[in-house]
């Protein structure tokens, strides 16, 4: 029996595992290895921070959900992949080391939030990128009496060599891994403090390591700047954060921004497990270069999906799901199941929600990749879409078989 390991438990990995098992059935054993038995619907973690959702509402127990679909599950932290001998090494919850051989592996363990690169993070930093981060921020916001808030992202340490075997325009250079959560939090906080009657006591500054929202068209960026102007939000470009202090943040050039609360999408680097793997599996940033079918350019039994793939820029949930689906479809063909393989075409697709004010901004944009689509639409119906998508993900336990049909809402 062909053995397929899927590493990870978020959008890319779960999409790959569920899709592959649905396609190949008993033709392959599919096993997921993830560092936790729980997976979370991360697009709603900002909602936890502002108190409209609880973390437990967003939790999927993979040890129950995956076996229900005929997929094996193993809790364990991946330490490295030996691509030459087709082995994965991981640490079990009890601390013991284990190894597992594979015929094929789909790598979806994401990147690394490099908080260690920002001085003062442990004492003064806040974020919404992990469940525990969102909960900590929620507690801070509840007790906040007013002052300065800075929201932004750290630098993205993108790999460049070797390059993936895809059209060059599909992989633009990015200063930030993804600024969608920054945009969303800036809108959410306006609604949050308006509800608390504190707008006159709070001053928000949004910062970016490069040009803010550079993955959108100039017209969309102008629209965002106009929204910020109306909301009284200050925008600072080219601010590469180096340190968080009690009442300010500092960039690499010594510039400062007032900040009594700093909300940060931390610097983004390659996953340590991938950097520890077979050297020619990854690029110089620790990401896996692939072709358009998500197959490694060096090892044809290795697939990479989501943030672990060097091709996915920015590091976006929509792209993770697309890559997971394509990898599964391509592998199904190799396992003897004729399957149409979707074409990879990168597009920025996201919804920046503002639940307290009852609207969201729906974004669809491919201009960064040479396309002509540029939509940034604020509307009440988009808030409803985000609510429904959250419910759909939780209802399916991450098995979003209809996602590609729903994404064009």
Swiss-Prot record:
GO cellular component: membrane
CC cofactor: FAD
Note accompanying the cofactor annotation: Binds 1 FAD per subunit.
Keyword Flavoprotein: yes
Cellular location(s): Membrane
An annotated Gene Ontology molecular function: sulfide:quinone oxidoreductase activity
Lineage top rank: taxon: Archaea
Topology versus the membrane: Peripheral membrane protein
Family matches, as SUPFAM superfamilies: FAD/NAD(P)-binding domain (SSF51905)
Protein family per UniProt: Belongs to the SQRD family.
Task of the protein: Catalyzes the oxidation of sulfides, such as hydrogen sulfide, with the help of a quinone. Has the highest activity with caldariella quinone and decylubiquinone, and lower activity with naphtoquinones. Consecutive reaction cycles lead to the accumulation of a polysulfide product on the active site Cys residues; these products are released when they exceed a critical length, typically as cyclooctasulfur.
Official protein name in the record: Sulfide-quinone reductase
Source species: Acidianus ambivalens
């Amino acid at each position: 029996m062909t053995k397929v390991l899927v590493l990870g438990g978020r959008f890319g990995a779960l999409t790959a595992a569920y899709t592959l098992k649905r396609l190949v059935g008993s033709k392959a054993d599919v096993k997921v290895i993830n560092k936790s038995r729980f997976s979370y619907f991360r697009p709603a973690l900002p909602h936890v921070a502002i108190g409209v959702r609880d973390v437990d509402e967003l939790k999927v127990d993979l040890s129950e959900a995956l076996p229900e679909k005929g997929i094996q599950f193993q809790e364990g932290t991946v330490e490295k992949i030996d691509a030459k001998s087709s082995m994965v090494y991981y640490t079990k919850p009890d601390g013991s080391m284990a190894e597992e051989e594979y015929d094929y592996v789909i790598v979806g363990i994401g990147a690394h939030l490099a908080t260690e690169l920002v001085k003062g993070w442990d004492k003064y930093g806040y974020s919404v990128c992990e469940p525990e981060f969102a909960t900590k921020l929620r507690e801070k916001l509840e007790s906040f009496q007013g002052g300065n808030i800075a929201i932004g992202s750290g630098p993205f340490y993108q790999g460049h060599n070797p390059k993936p075997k895809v059209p060059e325009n599909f992989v633009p250079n990015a200063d930030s891994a993804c600024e969608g959560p920054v945009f969303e939090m800036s809108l959410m906080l306006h609604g949050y403090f308006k509800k608390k009657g504190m707008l006159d006591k709070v001053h928000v500054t949004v910062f970016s390591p490069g040009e803010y929202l550079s993955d959108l068209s100039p017209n969309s960026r102008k629209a965002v700047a106009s929204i910020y102007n109306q909301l009284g939000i200050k925008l600072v470009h080219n601010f590469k954060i180096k340190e968080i202090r009690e009442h300010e943040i500092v960039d690499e050039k010594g510039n400062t921004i007032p900040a009594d609360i700093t909300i940060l999408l931390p610097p983004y680097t390659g996953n340590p497990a991938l950097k520890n793997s077979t050297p020619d599996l990854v690029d110089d940033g620790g990401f896996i270069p692939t072709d358009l079918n998500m197959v490694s350019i060096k090892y044809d039994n290795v697939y990479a999906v989501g943030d672990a793939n060097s091709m996915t820029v920015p590091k976006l949930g929509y792209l993770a799901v697309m890559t997971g689906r394509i990898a599964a479809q391509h592998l199904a063909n190799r396992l003897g199941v004729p399957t149409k393989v979707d074409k990879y075409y990168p597009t920025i697709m996201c919804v920046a929600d503002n639940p307290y004010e009852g609207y969201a901004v729906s974004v669809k944009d491919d201009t960064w990749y040479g396309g002509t689509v540029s939509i940034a639409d604020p509307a009440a119906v988009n808030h409803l879409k985000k609510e429904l998508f959250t419910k759909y993900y939780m209802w399916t336990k991450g098995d979003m078989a209809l996602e590609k049909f729903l994404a064009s809402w």
